[in-house]
C-alpha cells in the first residue's frame, strides 16, 4: 500500500503530455471541454498545459483554472523564473517544475554540470514557492540518473519548498522489478511527501511500471487518456485506474463508469481512434466470438471477463463470425426477437461462417437478411 494510503490520486496530463502527440493541436474550447470531463470523472490534478509555450496556451490554462471546480489545475514549467511567472499568471493551483538529472541530458541537452542543476533547483523552486502555490518537482529522465545524485536533487527541491515530487521514466526504460527498487530506494532516503510516478510506454511497460510504483510506495499516478502522448504514449488513465481498483484493491476518486465516455471524447477531439483491442475502453475489450467463450459468458460473465463492462461505461458484445457457435447464434436471434428453431440456427451458423471468410461483418442488418432468406427458402451461396 502506497505510503500507508488507501486512496491513490490521479494526475492527468492529457492536455499537456497527451497533446504533445504528433499531429494533435487542441483549440482553447477543446482543451476546456476535456478538462471539464476530467474534472467530472474525478481526476485529482489536471495538467492543463505549459503556460510558457504561448499566449493561447496560457489563456487556455487560465480559463480551465477558472472553470474547473474540483480538481487542482497544474501548469508545467522549466526551471526558469520566466516559466514560473507564466504559470503563476495562469492562476494555477500547482506549478510543475522540472529539470533533467541524467548525465546524458545534463551534457547534451542543457550543457550544465550536476552542481549547476542543483543550484537552479534551489533557486527556482524557492522563487516559485513565493507565489503561494503548491510546487511539484520532477527530475526529468530520473530512471537513467545516478541514484545518489537523483536523491540529492529531490532533497534539494524539498528543502527549497517542493510539496510533492515526481519520478518520470522519460524514455520508458524501466521494468517492474527495477521500478520497485527505485521507488523503495527513494522512499528510504526522502521525507514522506507525496510521490508521483510518470511512465512512458516505449517498451509497452508504462501501466505495469505505474502499478508497480504504486505497490511500492508511490501515491500519485500520472496518466493520459487512451495511452496517447508523444512517441509510444504514456500510461493509460483507464488501465491504471482499473488495475488500481480491481487488482490492487485500492481506491481512487475516479468514477469508473465515466471511463468509456471520457475515452471517446478524447479520441474525437484528438482525431485519433481508440484501437479496438484497447484494454477497458476498446470496442473489443468485452467482445466475444469463439463459441466456447460465448457459452461461458452467457452462463456467467466472469468466466471470460475480469470486470463488468457496464462498471467502466463499456458494454458486452457477442460477435458473429468464423469462430461462432450455436450459443452465439441463439443469443443473436433472441436479441432480434426471432425464435431460434434448430433449423434456423443451423442455417444462420452456416451462413455466418461462409460470410466470415469473405470478410463480411455480420451485423444486425446482415443477420436480418440471413433470417429473411431462410424464411424464403433461399440458399446462402452469395455475398451479402
From Swiss-Prot:
Pathway: Amino-acid biosynthesis; L-leucine biosynthesis; L-leucine from 3-methyl-2-oxobutanoate: step 1/4. A divalent metal cation binds at residues 17, 198, 200, 234. Signal peptide: none annotated. Disulfide bonds: none annotated. Its EC number is 2.3.3.13. InterPro entries: 2-IPM_HCS-like (IPR050073), AIPM/Hcit_synth_CS (IPR002034), Aldolase_TIM (IPR013785), LEU1_arch (IPR011830), LeuA/HCS_post-cat (IPR054691), PYR_CT (IPR000891). Keywords: Amino-acid biosynthesis, Branched-chain amino acid biosynthesis, Leucine biosynthesis, Metal-binding, Transferase. It catalyses: 3-methyl-2-oxobutanoate + acetyl-CoA + H2O = (2S)-2-isopropylmalate + CoA + H(+). It holds the Pfam family HMGL-like. GO terms for biological process: L-leucine biosynthetic process. One of its GO terms (molecular function) is metal ion binding. Its cofactor is a divalent metal cation. Residues 8-260 form the Pyruvate carboxyltransferase domain. Catalyzes the condensation of the acetyl group of acetyl-CoA with 3-methyl-2-oxobutanoate (2-oxoisovalerate) to form 3-carboxy-3-hydroxy-4-methylpentanoate (2-isopropylmalate). NCBIfam families: LEU1_arch (TIGR02090), PRK00915.1-2 (NF002085). Homodimer. Belongs to the alpha-IPM synthase/homocitrate synthase family. PANTHER family: 2-ISOPROPYLMALATE SYNTHASE 1, CHLOROPLASTIC-RELATED, HOMOCITRATE SYNTHASE-RELATED. This is Probable 2-isopropylmalate synthase. It comes from Pyrobaculum aerophilum (strain ATCC 51768 / DSM 7523 / JCM 9630 / CIP 104966 / NBRC 100827 / IM2).
